Swiss-Prot record:
It comes from Solibacter usitatus (strain Ellin6076). This is 2,3-bisphosphoglycerate-dependent phosphoglycerate mutase. InterPro entries: His_Pase_superF_clade-1, His_PPase_superfam, PG/BPGM_mutase_AS, Phosphogly_mut1. Catalyzes the interconversion of 2-phosphoglycerate and 3-phosphoglycerate. It is an enzyme of class 5 (isomerase).
Amino acid sequence: MKKLVLIRHGESTWNKENRFTGWTDVDLSDEGRQQATEAAEVLKREGYVFDVAYTSVLKRAIRTLWTVLDGMDLMWIPVHRSWRLNERHYGALQGLNKAETAAKFGEDQVKIWRRSYDIPPPVLTADDPRFPGHDPRYQSLTKEELPLTECLKDTVARFLPLWHDTIAPAIRSGQRVIIAAHGNSLRALVKYLDGVSEADIVELNIPTGMPLVYELDDDLKPLNRYYLGDPEKVKAAMEAVAAQGKKK
C-alpha cells in the first residue's frame, strides 16, 4: 500500500476577506500560518515522512509547504513547483468579495461559478492586469495555456499531465509524496482518483490546512482516504468553505 498526502494551503488573506483569489498571489493570514504549523505537528506526530514534495507557483501554497516541511525537519527534500497545481483561474471574479457577488448575481449563480464542473466564471480580457500573461513567472507558457478564466474541467485538464508524467511515477517508484496546493487543483485530483461524478463534485469542499491522506494500491487506485485531525473540526471547516458563496 502507498500513501499520498494532500494539503490545501492554510487560510490566505483573501480567504479571510472572502474574496475570489484564483491566480492572484496573496500570502497566508496569521491563522493560515498557524494552520500550516498545526498540520506539520499532526503529520510528525502520526509518523509521516516524505521523500519529495509538489506545490504550485503561488506563495500561499509554497509557504504552507515550507512551514510543514520545516516543522517536520524535512526542508532538505526536493520540492517541485508547477503552475499546473495553481488554483483555478476565476477570471473576472478574481478580487471580488464572494458574499457581495452572491448578493448581486444570486447564490445559485455563484455556486455554479464556484463549484460546477464545466461552467467557467466570466472571462478576463488579455489587457486586464489580472491576466497571467503579464506575470513573468508564466513567460514560458503558450498563449493557449494562459487562462482568461477556468472551470474545474479546465483545471483537471491542465493538472493531469503533471500527475501522469511526474507525480504518479514518483509514487509508483516508492517515493512518499506530499502535495501542497489549492482547493480546486486538489478537487481536480480527488475527482480523478475517486471517479467523482460531475454532479457530485459540486458538493465537495476541501478545508484549508488539514492533511488529507490517500491510501493507494499498486495501480494507484484509492483504498481509503481520510483527514488527519479532529473529525468535528474537519467537518466544521468543510461547512465553512461551502458557506463562503452565500449572501450575508
